[in-house]
Amino acid sequence: KTKVQSKRHTIISGPPGIGKSFSTMDEIAKANINYIQFGAGSSDSAIALELAYGVSQLSAGEELVVLLDDADDVVFRDYETANKFKFAMAKDKPFYAQDVNLMTARKQYEKAGRMDLVQAIDAFTVPGKVGIHIPTDQVRFYVVCNRDCENPKEFTKKIFSAVEAIVDRTKYKRLDFEYKVAWGWLAHILDNNQPFEDYPLTEDQKRELAGWVWDKWPNMRNQSYRTIEEMAEYMINNPDGYEDEWAATFIKSSSKKAGQ
C-alpha cells in the first residue's frame, strides 16, 4: 500500500499507436474502480455536468477517477480549457469551474425529469457566482495525449504557460518508442485480446494481421490499436478481399504512388 503521495494526477504522453488509451483503460477495468471518461469532442458543459454528478455521489474517503482521453483536444485545445484543468489539479482547494449560467439548462432538465442533473447543478452552485464550481480534492485525473507536454514547440506560448503548470502538478510519463517496440506493444495487445469478442480471430489471422502491419509500418497512415480493430473488421467481414481493403485504406497515398 502507498504510504505517501506527492502528486495525485498522471499524464501519459506519447505518439499514436503505442497503446496509451488501451492500456490505461485496461488497468482501470482490472482495478474495478469508480471512473468516468471523456474523449475528443466532449463539450465543457458535458464534462462539468458529468463531473458534478460523479463528485456529488462520493462519500467521505471515496475517490473518482477521471480519464481524459485524446487530451490534445479535451485539455490542451486552448488556454482557457487548459487553465480550467490547471485549477482542477491544484494541490490546495482544487476545483473545476464552468462559469456559464446553467439556470436555463436546469429548468430543461427538471422539466425532463432529469433530477440527477438538477441535483448535481444545485450541489455546486455557489451564491454570488455564475455557473458551478466543483471541488476536485476527491478526483484523480489521468490525462492521455500525443503531444509532448514538456516541449514548448508543441503549443502556443500562452497555452504552454498553463501546460507547464499542469505538468508540474502531475506525474508525467513520456513514452517515445522506436517502431519495433511500438509494433511489439500492438502485437502484444492483439495477442491477448479480441477486437470483436463475438467473432474471434484465430491465432493464424492475428499473426497475419500483425505481420502485415510490421511489413507496411513506414508506409501506414496510422498505427494505433484503432487501426488494428478496423483491419480486423475487414478481415471478418470480407474474408476474400480484406488485403485489398487494407492496402486501399491504410497505406499512405504517397507510398501508393511511389509503388506505381
What are these regions (language model features)?
Residues 61-66, 135-142:
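Loop/turn-to-beta-strand initiation segments
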Residues 69-71:
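Walker B catalytic acidic pair
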Residues 21-43, 96, 105, 109-114:
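Conserved P-loop NTPase mechanochemical-coupling segment
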Residues 137, 154-178:
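A short helix-turn-beta junction within AAA+ P-loop NTPase domains corresponding to the substrate/partner-engaging
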Residues 79-136, 146:
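Conserved catalytic/switch belt of AAA+ P-loop NTPases
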Residues 4-24:
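Walker A/P-loop nucleotide-binding motif
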Residues 18, 30-64, 73-77:
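AAA+/P-loop NTPase substrate/partner-engagement loops
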Residues 182-255:
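Conserved AAA+ ATPase small/helical "lid" subdomain
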